[in-house]
């Protein structure tokens, strides 16, 4: 039995706020980042400043200006022990699903564009001291990104329905990572985190999932030797390494055939992981059926989301630049340089 949320009494966001936030943060994050870079801070400091100033401050300011209920808007409710336990069970399965989707996405991007785009700054951060890496790549995004997407944006979108809020916030979250090959994986994480936060009413459960995903990937990257990438760059073939060639030669097959077999295996593991996650979601629905709060929908309120179109346009321009650069078109690099992404 879902409880009804009284939006007027609690003063919670509406779709207009979600769209406004996405546009403001997208423009702020994409364009204003280049001004922080002019101070010549380290990559670590740049990341902290961009996450806090661009992802946390705007939604908090909007909530304060419009006098929204901070605790309810951002779902600052302590998670129940059973919920935390379930998050810890879901997390590794989600990481496997995300890794499989990411590998398949990498192959897809290489197949479509012939090359892939590697974000070197993130790779460098993951290869840092393990504690610093976890703080910067796992803890910081888990807190800042969740407050924006599962806080202000998702809460506002709930006025058009819980299902739409989960779907749209997940899509917006995936797009915001500006990465073709990770788009599917990040969107999957966005859907799952959005659903978990909605069902449990606690943003901290979303943070646990987010931290677990980034944290495990960071640990993997931290202990991988010889794979450092300095700066963002285009790589023609990320699989053109001795290890792949040796494995292919061992089984008397080509590297392309090896990658095809790996893609099929990863697809199977992805399907199994998604099935397991679906089963765990059923368990989550069961333990939250008496506590989940049903949002109060308002007919026509979705029109307010149109203010988010400039933000989507901004992100679309970035993806266009990335695509053109992968196609070896000089216009792509010019677009990304103009946007402050290079």
Model-flagged regions — what are they?
Residues 2-8, 33, 44-92, 107-112, ...:
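Membrane-helix interface linkers and caps
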Residues 24-65, 267-271, 334-342:
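Alpha-helical transmembrane segments in multi-pass membrane proteins
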Residues 24-33, 56-61, 266-286, 310-325:
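Hydrophobic core of alpha-helical transmembrane segments in multi-pass integral membrane proteins
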Residues 39-44, 123-127, 238-267:
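Membrane-interface segments at the starts/ends of alpha-helical transmembrane spans
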Residues 41-46, 71-144, 324-342:
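Juxtamembrane helix-loop-helix connectors linking adjacent transmembrane helices
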Residues 56-57, 92, 97, 119-183, ...:
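Function-critical hydrophobic alpha-helical transmembrane segments in multi-pass membrane proteins
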Residues 175, 184-250:
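Functionally important transmembrane alpha-helices
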Residues 295-342:
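C-terminal regulatory/interaction regions
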